[in-house]
Amino acid sequence: MEESQGYLELYKSGQHDFLYPLIFQEYIYVLAHDHGLNRSILLENLGSDNKFSSLIVKRLITRMYQQNRLIISANDSNQNPFLGHNKDLYSQIISEGFAVIVEIPFPLRLVSSLERKEIVKSHNLRSIHSVFPFLEDKFLHLNYVSDILIPHPIHLEILVQTLRYWVKDASSLHLLRFFLYEYRNWNSLINPKKSIFVFSKRNQRLFLFLYNSHVYEYESVFVFLRNQSSHLRSTSSGALLERIYFYGKIKHLVEVFANDFQAILWLFKDTFVHYVRYQGKSILASKGTPLLMNKWKYYLVNFWQCNFYVWSQPVRIYINQLSNHSLYFLGYISSVGLNPSVVRNQMLENSFIIDNAIKKFDIIVPIIPLIGSLAKAKFCNVLGHPISKPARADSSDSDIIDRFVRICRNLSHYHSGSSKKKSLYRIKYILRLSCARTLARKHKSPVRAFLKRLGSELLEEFLTEEEQVLSLIVPASSTSRRLYRGRIWYLDIICINDLANHE
């Protein structure tokens, strides 16, 4: 959102047709590919009156070009971009440019929505970890959870139709429709053999945007039904509905929905229903009965098929009881268990033993899938025994260590919310010994002799920032070190490490 800030100021002038001219500016695709650009230049010299001017845009993209040598040249290929052998490259370039352009109107809607709801530090809500404290507070009081596999649209035209409510630029939508139809048969866009919508890594930004736009349409109706059927209205659900990728959030729907759905609201008188979406799936948790959960199940299936033209089946929604079911969610295994405790009550000459059970929300790291991810990346075998990385043997020692340390710290950072740290210690051991084996293989030395020569230097490299600070200022037996072994949630994690994602 920051990299488009300069264009947002121009968009505020009311020129809604501003998007279409940007599509044909080759510099916009440089912006799409750039990640290290000094974004402050977008905030400078926008003009005193902030009116729309193609000259302002030209000056901005010229300044960006002066700091970026990555430019799309027509001489790179004489092939037709849609028919030539470079179609994968051009698909990536065009889709990333489209994604940057169509995202421009949405940050303004988000900012205005957050200002109305007086939400401070909204960037913290984008963190994946911000979901888990919510689950800790709510799931202890709920009984059932539904694992929902979100259906994908059966036709690309549905995605374009969804954007009509957000982007008032018919020319841009027509060109987007042409682009989607031109590539609709490519395996890199949609794989028809799978039951869910699959995004290409090369076109991920655009198609995640289109997919989230489509899903948000029926989620808006879902939030409306939830608020209408609940005596406790939620004022912030519009901003907290999707925290990861999607920008546009709204507060209310048009009043026509009240007439369409009033007849079925009596089915869903549930004041404790919570919804979370992630990675093409969603979770619907409730304090209600199995009958109520089944009503939600069949209603969602009919709602998707009749109103949004997506194919779904009841078997795609699994209803489980939280007390005896573990939930695999964003790289963690979450469960609600009972923590038994015995209380002795003394009354005069009589004493009583009272058995008491307290619900506890437990979150652990799934060690077997994580080791499987490490084995797939060639850090260890399927049994978890560390192996060397021959592909890294031609790098310098410092580069090899930095790469292993970066992976180790990223995994530790993401899985810091685990209530059991022993699994993380095993992962650190695998990465540390794999790094040592890689270095020993490079220097043609035995691993034991190489570790003896390095001593504790290699071990210190793999310590996280928190462990380094605690090792300096906190004694090993203090309560602060025991506190570190508890769950820690970070508000700066907006993506999942590939090794942590076992989906």
UniProtKB/Swiss-Prot annotation:
Keywords: Chloroplast, mRNA processing, Plastid, RNA-binding, tRNA processing. GO terms for molecular function: RNA binding. The keyword RNA-binding applies. The keyword Amino-acid biosynthesis does not apply. GO terms for cellular component: chloroplast. Signal peptide: none annotated. It comes from the Eukaryota. One of its GO terms (biological process) is mRNA processing. InterPro entries: Domain_X, Maturase_MatK, Maturase_MatK_N. It holds the Pfam family MatK_N. It is found in: Plastid, Chloroplast. Usually encoded in the trnK tRNA gene intron. Probably assists in splicing its own and other chloroplast group II introns. Belongs to the intron maturase 2 family. MatK subfamily. This is Maturase K. It comes from Liquidambar orientalis. The gene is matK.
